Amino acid sequence: MSSGDPAHLGLCLWLWLGATLGREQVQASGLLRLAVLPEDRLQMKWRESEGSGLGYLVQVKPMAGDSEQEVILTTKTPKATVGGLSPSKGYTLQIFELTGSGRFLLARREFVIEDLKSSSLDRSSQRPLGSGAPEPTPSHTGSPDPEQASEPQVAFTPSQDPRTPAGPQFRCLPPVPADMVFLVDGSWSIGHSHFQQVKDFLASVIAPFEIGPDKVQVGLTQYSGDAQTEWDLNSLSTKEQVLAAVRRLRYKGGNTFTGLALTHVLGQNLQPAAGLRPEAAKVVILVTDGKSQDDVHTAARVLKDLGVNVFAVGVKNADEAELRLLASPPRDITVHSVLDFLQLGALAGLLSRLICQRLQGGSPRQGPAAAPALDTLPAPTSLVLSQVTSSSIRLSWTPAPRHPLKYLIVWRASRGGTPREVVVEGPAASTELHNLASRTEYLVSVFPIYEGGVGEGLRGLVTTAPLPPPRALTLAAVTPRTVHLTWQPSAGATHYLVRCSPASPKGEEEEREVQVGRPEVLLDGLEPGRDYEVSVQSLRGPEGSEARGIRARTPTLAPPRHLGFSDVSHDAARVFWEGAPRPVRLVRVTYVSSEGGHSGQTEAPGNATSATLGPLSSSTTYTVRVTCLYPGGGSSTLTGRVTTKKAPSPSQLSMTELPGDAVQLAWVAAAPSGVLVYQITWTPLGEGKAHEISVPGNLGTAVLPGLGRHTEYDVTILAYYRDGARSDPVSLRYTPSTVSRSPPSNLALASETPDSLQVSWTPPLGRVLHYWLTYAPASGLGPEKSVSVPGARSHVTLPDLQAATKYRVLVSAIYAAGRSEAVSATGQTACPALRPDGSLPGFDLMVAFSLVEKAYASIRGVAMEPSAFGGTPTFTLFKDAQLTRRVSDVYPAPLPPEHTIVFLVRLLPETPREAFALWQMTAEDFQPLLGVLLDAGKKSLTYFHRDPRAALQEATFDPQEVRKIFFGSFHKVHVAVGRSKVRLYVDCRKVAERPLGEMGSPPAAGFVTLGRLAKARGPRSSSAAFQLQMLQIVCSDTWADEDRCCELPASRDGETCPAFVSACSCSSETPGPPGPQGPPGLPGRNGTPGEQGFPGPRGPPGVKGEKGDHGLPGLQGHPGHQGIPGRVGLQGPKGMRGLEGTAGLPGPPGPRGFQGMAGARGTSGERGPPGTVGPTGLPGPKGERGEKGEPQSLATLYQLVSQASHVSKFDSFHENTRPPMPILEQKLEPGTEPLGSPGTRSKALVPGEWGRGGRHLEGRGEPGAVGQMGSPGQQGASTQGLWE
């Protein structure tokens, strides 16, 4: 039909109705037909439109002034049924066709349900469409249309038009008491805001009902992953209490398990203990927004078969098919869906009316005739869970007083998972559960099944044992590249996972994994001489046991041992070693210089124990590596270092005068071979030009022409080698026989004062004009000075020197013919004197830091108090006094390498427990270089300094004698520093001695600090508090053995120590005894130089001293007069080697090289094909004879109860406090062998086992034998048909 105007459509409908009245009770027309079904439901059908429309929209709208909301539904078929309409109110019905371009009106009709039922043919009349008067329509009282069952589910949505409230509010008082349980979905998909709309909906549905103990009782359960009773039927007795409880209802959250919730309602809410009344009608209203994650069919069938009216309300994504499966018939009354939570409000009034009509339409006894009452049934007791393994549990219980037909055993993981069940015969009182997951807590329930229903169940929690790990891991065989591992199998394991990884990985080495079916594995491709961590884990499906590990070390390929060197020269060396015990194919020796510029390789037979390396470069360090090569690879490398000697110089030089002015120079060759040329240079002393000649390397003599008979010469010779090396030059002083210039002898140095040295010598024979003295600090850090001494004197004093400093002095005699050789000697100036008599050289640091009576007041953080024993006062250094001086202000000269640090100290209670430097020298950046540390926490003393290589050397003393320093009394401590050791004395008694490396040169610049904390850095760092009475550095390491510690009363000796000076004042004028010797005064200024004294008498000749160092070059003489031209020289020797020539032709190919080492392991191979299908399992045993069958209605009930797979799921045993945890269960395929892991090498490992026989899903075996026929008269249901 076209989408023409509504007036034409109404006219056609009016004409059709007028022509057909009186033919039958049901109004009919060619376009629209209405029929009234039981419970005042209205069924409508219309003619299907031509073309491809999108469906139909049906609108049932109350007439003006009605307070009810309109009803809109959509359908794909030309029929629909509407329920919940008021029989006495008028409605307007419109049917639209939905197309892609909009909607088009097909039919319109106004009706009243009572008029349609009561109108008769003689009172029928028509009225124009839109008149507003109700149209009388005969009632259709027969059965519903047989096509009704196939009608699509429709959705009720509220109209967007505003409604004007009118009429009284609806109230419902059923003729019989009613027990109403609301089952509300509280899953995460609803949300907090929508859950408030759900609570408003519940309040609107409950509001019309009269609530009381003898009227309507309301209970409510909220569910998600588990079900929770919010209140029972008998908990609240008034409507106000119920509505208040709805408002207080809190959102639960979780997953959607509707089947579990229905079983909870059956087992908990619909029980006499919860307020259920046997005479009351029972109604369950389900509100959900999604599809259940578990089975709902069984629990819903049990509820409906027990006479419970189930209404289902779905929102948004609710599964309509599932709602229809849950609800009681008729589905068009009990199933409702809305598209959004906002539309629940429009459905509330309609749902209240439908529930009320259902309660008014029949008593609670209208259910199935055979439906049993929900009475309490006997239950078993004393559930015992025993014989727990990793995959099985044994259950036993005390049977109920009345034996049930069967027991339903239901179990599932307590933290979520799919429940499983098994049925055992009634007489049994125990069973075993198999195929469980290891280390999993299970909730187990046992339900007795009687003819009248399901009794209360037993429940228990049990945790399966872990899968046992492998035991007794054993290394059956270990080779350099393989490990054979075995172990004892573990019960229940189907295969094993073996992991192998290096104990100390190198780079990106990965862990290797392999799965095996037998308790052994062969791991290959390993590296020799490495530790491997191997672990084995038992597996059963996806489960794994605790891993057991073992460490395996592959043996190394034996390397050579005891590497050594001999016959080391400047260009060759011999390396030797101890051979390996196993047969060696070849020994490879490689060497490379430390700079990497020179390398080489040589190979020796397998039985060789030495090899010669060469040619090498002189004065070069080589790294030598020796490796044994075996047929299976190379051993580890033995490494050593060798340094070649310096290129040797010619030796044993001698000069022989020849006739005329020629002289022959002879020498011993520098090396047997390798010398390319000798270069000889001679230079006359004083004035003259140097001459040079070259001699071939195979000669040992040379003639030097043109030497004057009255001139001395310096002759130098050096050797050049073929590898480019050059020896050190060797010099010889040649003096003709006609010239004699002897140097002075017996040169001696003595220290008169800290700033002067006395030099004396024995004059030589001959007329000496004067002596030339040159002196400078031996360290080379100071300036060089010279002085001339008259020839008549043989001694001189060198003034203005640094104290405690070594000086090198050279003296040469000046003759008329020139200068003699210089003789040298080394001497050291004395340290400053600590005593007036100069008997104790050293440095007084108390004076340097102004810790004296007349100067301490100007120092911040320092206080002075008289000594308890008289004599020297005591100075207290408070915390953070920060006493710091520059090195140059404290030590006018460097410290001698051998010295003694002396201090008299007392540690105070406020002295910190951490280490601090009583005295130390630092660099400019305050890095410690030298000092003494006291650690009150460890009760130890540490001395440290830097050696000549700037490395830190330290010695720590912590014996019992050292601990008393920290007990709060004064103690005198000597730290005697020698060249190779340091000794500690406490109260003049030796405590300990420690070896220590030689001290380097003390810093000339930097700082000296007192009490500085060891961790402190920078100029403003913290310092410790302590008392100090003495701090000296004595320029000797033997002073500790001479000191008598007279400052301490316990160490005083009356014979050697003077009496203490009393600090008390005496009234007597009698002078007392002389006081102790006072401290040395400050150095005075230098006096004016005195007049030169007379020469003293010549002393006796001294002992000949050691040969001195090479003298410094003499002063540059004045240019001489130009000489006459010389004679024509002799023909010179052969010149030096020329430049390198061009490269020669390529040589012949070398011999075939040795086989290289094994390459790295290749990449993993591709995954192998699936294994073959395992053998079919053995057939199960023949089933027992079935029991006598029951009547069909009772058998049907048993069948429904047995399918209640979720009876135990709704039990709230320990579930309210336990969050849901999904358990991943692997789907097993029959007899399929698992895929193997990819192999790492082509070599086959230990063969795997055949796959075990698969387990049929749901734990069923082979079908049992057909049960025998029951007794005549009643056909028995077989066991399989009853319980599947």
From Swiss-Prot:
Glycosylation sites (chain numbering): N607
Swiss-Prot/TrEMBL keywords: Collagen, Glycoprotein, Repeat, Secreted, Signal
Comp. bias (Low complexity): 1112-1125, 1166-1181
Keyword Repeat: yes
Amino acid composition bias (Polar residues), ranges on this chain: 1271-1284
Subcellular location: Secreted, Extracellular space
Annotated Laminin G-like domain residues: 842-1037
Cellular component GO terms, alphabetical: collagen trimer; endoplasmic reticulum lumen; extracellular region
Sequence ranges assigned to domain Collagen-like in this UniProt record: 1071-1127, 1133-1190
All copies of domain Fibronectin type-III, residue ranges: 28-119, 379-468, 469-559, 560-647, 649-738, 743-833
Tissues in which the UniProt entry reports expression: High expression in heart, lung, liver, skeletal muscle, kidney, pancreas, spleen, testis, ovary, subthalamic nucleus and fetal liver. Weak expression in other tissues tested.
Protein name: Collagen alpha-1(XX) chain
